[in-house]
Amino acid sequence: MKVLELGSCEEKIKILETLDYTNNPEILESIISKLDDDDIQVRGEAFSSLVLNKNKISNFLIKGLNSASKNIIGFTLLVLANRNETIAIPEIIKLAKDERSMVRECAIGALGYLKAQEAKEIFLKSLLDSNLEVRKSALQAVIDLNITVSENKIKEMIKEKDSEIEKLLFQLKKK
C-alpha cells in the first residue's frame, strides 16, 4: 500500500483499478484518502473503486465524512449517493449545514439523489443559501422529490438572473 502513498500517479491509478473488491479497513481508508489526491485522475479512480466496491463498506464511507478535507467529504458524499447508501442519510443531513459551500452542495445533492424526504425542510431552506451552487442542488432536489415551494421563494429565486436556475424554476412550475 506504500504505492498509494508514495507512488507516481500512474502507479496509484494502476493499484486503485485493482482494489474495487477490498473490504480491508486499512486499504479502504487509504482509498478514501486518495479522494484528496493532488491528481484528478487518482481522485477519479479512487471514486470509481469505492462506487464499484460490492462489499458492505458504508461504515468506512460514513467515517470518511468526518475528514477535515472538503474533497474527501464531498467525494464521499457522492460515493454514498451513487451506492444508494440510505443508511447514511442522518450523517449527510448534518453536513447540509456545513460552513463550506462545496460540502453543503454535495450533501444537498446526495440527499436529493437518495430521495431523502426527511430532508424536505433543508432543501427548502437551502433554496436561499448564500451559494448559487447550493441553491441549484436544492432546487433540483425539490423538483425531483415533488416538494411544493412557496411563491415568495420562487420570486426570490427569479431575481437570481441565472440561466440554470431559470431552467430549473421552469421545470418546477411545470410539475
Please provide the spans of the model-predicted regions.
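Short inter-helical turns and helix N-cap capping residues of alpha-solenoid HEAT/ARM repeat scaffolds
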Residues: 7-8, 38-39, 68-69, 99-100, ...
